């Protein structure tokens, strides 16, 4: 007998007519594709009906859940199968109904993070077991969000972002010189800048009507339409600046342009400023037909206005409405009349036109020493004048905040809170209009105004944008108000000086500073001299301003 195990040859089926086995395999056998990396599923899940987005398909097959070709369907109905705890819940006694609410609230906070919108828990269909929007989310979330100014909407991280449009279209022949983000600008500082020195003063001011300080919600006053004109020409179009540029200064601008640059870190909307450099002289100007002079509304709010163009609550309509309100309000609170006293400066209004009634505005052309032979000449303005109890003249900057729809703006109701909680109203406006209030404060500080008068103007009806009423007045000292709103003037001067230094290092030409519409940064472009000549009224600039600029270069 052999000591080795016998080797038996296996049977090998030979298919002489093709490739593969000769016999057909068994049919009608259930088959489900399987991958070793698939997670084992659960028979039942008794957690709250909240689906996590990060692991939404963690129990799905690798081969896809929509592939029904290999799906297995059980056709036999098992009538004896029952869900566990599927009966009617035991009725709770009145003192037991709120026992488990805190745990349920905590679950909402944990799982509600990955839920889109407000419809996952307690939304419009009842959320976790509720009906008609009375679920957990509405009960514990809505009131809290209203108290915090809808801060709870931070969970809407996956909501679609609406991109803002640029104030000017960047063309292909523009050369990008530098990009500066806001964190870098916030670190700048230029301390010990002394108050500006008056170079030229011109215009006429009317006195403030002290009866307006008695206006309140119960004693409101309709806002009137004042048919007066306030001329706000650009830097190069100003005849006084043209005259001064030949003998003093090397940086020229207006107060609104300087305020825009100083407060650029608080802005969200896009804006642009045109710069002309000739030798050592720099002119900061604005484009013709631009919306630079229009005021923004709720620019820094959590939910800025996003209605379509044509609606009374669209950003364009609200901006025009706020600008007209400020114009009418700044004139209505003054003593208007031929017999009323007026304060006249040394020179008349340089923008006076025959047959046109000008508004009560006075202009101060002031000089600042910014160091390193950088001398700033800027045009500032006052809106009114008042006599103090000691008989001294005090110059005023008069502005107006407007309420359009408190519910749509997520703000407080002025008619309910203005008399009793004026601080809450102002805090809400500081949150929603931080950039606009900061620019007003900077303009008042630059002009040397003794008081900043703020008026509260609201619509008669939130659906009527043509009729308004004055609900109250409030006054501040500009320097104190700057401290109150956390406006650092040293940083503001540092931002301006930084931008001026960058431009002074460039060759002569035309440049443009633009705030990025969707990013917290500003960009500096080198643009052609005829970049905006295709606009409607830029022919005047080509024929009038260019010879003036060339004469300065010579």
Swiss-Prot record:
InterPro entries: eIF3d. One of its GO terms (cellular component) is eukaryotic 43S preinitiation complex. Residues 116-149, 532-554 are annotated as: Disordered. It is found in: Cytoplasm. Keywords: Cytoplasm, Initiation factor, Protein biosynthesis, RNA-binding. Residues 120-140 have a biased composition (Gly residues). GO terms for molecular function: mRNA cap binding; translation initiation factor activity. The keyword S-adenosyl-L-methionine does not apply. One of its GO terms (biological process) is cap-dependent translational initiation. Its main location: cytoplasm. Belongs to the eIF-3 subunit D family. Component of the eukaryotic translation initiation factor 3 (eIF-3) complex. The eIF-3 complex interacts with pix. mRNA cap-binding component of the eukaryotic translation initiation factor 3 (eIF-3) complex, which is involved in protein synthesis of a specialized repertoire of mRNAs and, together with other initiation factors, stimulates binding of mRNA and methionyl-tRNAi to the 40S ribosome. The eIF-3 complex specifically targets and initiates translation of a subset of mRNAs involved in cell proliferation. In the eIF-3 complex, eif3d specifically recognizes and binds the 7-methylguanosine cap of a subset of mRNAs. The RNA gate region regulates mRNA cap recognition to prevent promiscuous mRNA-binding before assembly of eif3d into the full eukaryotic translation initiation factor 3 (eIF-3) complex. This is Eukaryotic translation initiation factor 3 subunit D-2.
């Amino acid at each position: 007998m052999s000591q080795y195990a016998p080797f038996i040859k296996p049977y090998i089926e030979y298919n002489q007519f093709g490739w593969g086995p000769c016999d057909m395999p068994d049919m009608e056998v259930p088959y489900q594709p399987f991958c070793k990396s698939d997670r084992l599923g659960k028979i039942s899940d008794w957690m709250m009906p909240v689906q996590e987005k990060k692991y939404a398909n963690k129990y799905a097959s690798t081969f896809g859940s929509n592939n029904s070709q290999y799906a297995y369907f059980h056709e036999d109905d098992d009538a004896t199968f029952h869900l566990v705890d599927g009966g009617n819940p035991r009725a709770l006694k009145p003192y037991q109904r709120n026992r488990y609410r805190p745990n349920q609230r905590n679950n909402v906070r944990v799982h509600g993070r990955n839920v889109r919108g407000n419809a996952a828990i307690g939304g419009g269909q009842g959320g976790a077991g509720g009906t008609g929007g009375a679920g957990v989310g509405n009960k514990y979330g809505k009131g809290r969000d209203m108290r915090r100014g809808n801060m709870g909407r931070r969970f809407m991280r996956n909501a679609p972002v609406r991109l803002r449009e640029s104030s000017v279209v960047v063309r292909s022949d523009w050369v990008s010189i530098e990009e500066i983000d806001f964190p870098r600008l916030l670190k700048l500082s230029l301390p010990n800048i002394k108050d500006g020195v008056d170079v030229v003063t011109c215009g006429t001011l009317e006195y403030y009507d002290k009866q307006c300080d008695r206006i309140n919600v119960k004693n409101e006053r309709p806002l009137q339409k004042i048919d007066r004109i306030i001329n706000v020409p650009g830097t190069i179009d100003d005849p006084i600046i043209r005259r001064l540029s030949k003998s003093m200064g090397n940086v020229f601008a207006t107060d609104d342009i300087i305020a825009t640059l100083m407060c650029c870190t608080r802005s969200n909307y896009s804006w642009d400023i045109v710069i002309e450099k000739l030798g050592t002289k720099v002119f900061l100007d604005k484009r013709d037909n631009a919306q630079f002079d229009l005021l923004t509304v709720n620019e820094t709010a959590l939910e800025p206005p996003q209605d379509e163009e044509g609606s009374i609550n669209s950003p364009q309509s609200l901006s025009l409405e706020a600008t007209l309100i400020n114009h009418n309000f700044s004139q209505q609170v003054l003593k208007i009349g031929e017999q009323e006293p007026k304060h006249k400066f040394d020179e008349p209004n340089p923008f006076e036109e025959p047959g046109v009634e000008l508004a009560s505005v006075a202009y101060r052309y002031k000089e600042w020493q910014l160091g390193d032979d950088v001398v700033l000449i800027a045009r500032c303005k006052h809106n009114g004048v008042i006599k103090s109890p000691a008989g001294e003249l005090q110059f005023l900057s008069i502005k107006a905040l407007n309420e359009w729809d408190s519910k749509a703006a997520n703000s407080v109701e002025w008619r309910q809170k203005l008399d009793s909680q004026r601080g809450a109203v102002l805090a809400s406006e500081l949150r929603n209009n931080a950039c606009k209030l900061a620019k007003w404060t900077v303009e008042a500080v630059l002009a040397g105004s003794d008081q900043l008068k703020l008026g509260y103007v609201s619509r008669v009806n939130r659906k009527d944008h043509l009729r308004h009423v004055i609900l109250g007045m409030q006054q501040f000292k500009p320097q104190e108000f700057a401290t109150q709103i956390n406006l650092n003037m040293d940083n503001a001067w540092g931002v301006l000086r930084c931008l001026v230094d960058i431009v002074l290092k460039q060759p002569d030409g035309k440049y443009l500073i633009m705030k990025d519409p969707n990013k917290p940064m500003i960009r500096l472009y080198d643009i052609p001299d005829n970049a905006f000549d295709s606009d409607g009224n830029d022919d005047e600039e080509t024929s009038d301003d260019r010879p003036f600029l060339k004469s300065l270069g010579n």
